[in-house]
A protein has these predicted regions:
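Glycine- and acidic/polar-rich repeat regions and solenoidal domains
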Residues: 1-208
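Surface beta-loop-beta hairpin patches that serve as ligand-binding interfaces in beta-rich domains
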Residues: 208, 216-267
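Solvent-exposed strand-loop boundary residues in beta-sheet-rich modules
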Residues: 150, 177, 262, 305-307
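Short loop/turn motifs at secondary-structure junctions and domain boundaries
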Residues: 131, 228-234, 291-293
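C-terminal outer-membrane/trafficking sorting elements
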Residues: 268-320
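Residue-level structural signal for beta-strand termini and adjacent loop
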Residues: 126, 152, 231, 253-254, ...
């Protein structure tokens, strides 16, 4: 099949997929951390960690009822480039909602598609898209926290309106200088730094790094999801817990993102942008110097696609 997500549902009913790690899916099609194929009812992906999946984070196809994603963390998903250089096709995506249901040209809109309270981090080397097709039905996109590295190519977004009922509100996007935001994504959105607990630009492979600090603008800034005591009505019952096990109120606005705690007071590690590398002309190593810092140094090495290669301790970094 030349592809495969970490998990996908097809023609399923009443599925809860939670507390999984979806990592390193690779292929020319699909290859998301997890995806919701077509013909499903009452499917929720929640409390999952998605890392370094070529296709992207969230894919929802057509002919579905009450299906979606909530309280997940996605790190460096969606690095695939379209082989033909075409936008909105096979390129990697953060969020993708379509109405595909098996056979072209037949299209099947869905009912009650939701993507809410997820935290997404994309580093400088990736630029996955956000794309909602036309005629996909009603789509609910709330309280998602999307952070991208400050450098790199522009991240494109396209939200089609033809034959769609769109409910998009209270999402956080940062840094918007690198995101070409479709105006449908701007409703009650926040554009400030969410103050992730650890804001290393390459993306820590650690869910704890994607909590937010106590003074984050994301705290209590979400859209209130409530209205039903039926826990399977995912658009009216928020599940009561976030990714980390913190409670989510049914009466007060939540945080934006997958973390609903009050936030720790300080970051995990010291951050500095003033790092110098001195290559040796005779040996295969570089020396690392960080201004105003004399403690231990740990360096993590990644490919341009965000794949982790190795980590080394100390101020001498071997290139062998």
């Amino acid at each position: 099949w030349k592809r495969g997500s970490g998990m996908w549902t097809f023609d399923c009913k009443n599925v809860v997929a939670q507390h999984n790690k979806f990592m390193n899916a690779h292929g020319p099609m699909d290859s998301y951390g997890s995806h919701i194929d077509y013909g499903n009812e009452n499917v929720v992906f929640q409390y999952n960690y998605s890392f370094n999946n070529e296709g992207g984070f969230a894919e929802i196809l057509g002919d579905n009822i009450n299906c979606g994603y909530r309280y997940n963390i996605s790190v460096n998903d969606g690095y695939r480039e379209d082989p033909n250089g075409v936008s909105w096709d096979k390129k990697g995506k953060i969020f993708w909602v379509s109405n595909y249901c098996g056979q072209n040209p037949i299209r099947c809109p869905s009912v009650g598609t939701f993507i809410y309270n997820n935290t997404v981090f994309v580093n400088d080397t990736l630029n996955p898209e956000i794309y909602i097709w036309p005629d996909v039905g009603d789509v609910h996109l709330y309280n998602n926290l999307v952070v991208v590295g400050q450098n790199g190519n522009v991240i494109s977004t396209l939200i089609e309106t033809d034959s769609n009922d769109l409910y998009i509100s209270h999402n956080l996007f940062y840094d918007t200088s690198r995101i070409d935001l479709d105006n449908k994504l701007e409703n009650n959105s926040v554009y400030e730094d969410p103050l992730l607990l650890n804001s290393v630009y390459l993306g820590e492979n650690d869910p704890a790094a994607y909590r937010i600090q106590s003074n984050s603008p994301a705290i209590n800034s979400g859209f209130l999801i409530n209205g039903s005591n039926d826990s399977t009505k995912y658009l009216e019952h928020n599940g009561g817990l976030d990714y980390f096990g913190n409670s989510v109120s049914h009466h007060l606005p939540s945080n934006i993102g997958a973390f609903n705690g009050s936030g720790p007071m300080q970051i995990l590690e010291q951050k500095t942008n003033d790092i110098k590398l001195f290559p040796s002309v005779t040996y295969d190593y570089v020396s690392i110097s960080i201004k105003n810092y004399s403690g231990p140094i740990n360096t993590e090495i990644y490919t341009l696609k965000g794949d982790f290669i190795n980590s080394q301790n100390g101020k001498i970094l071997s290139l062998k």
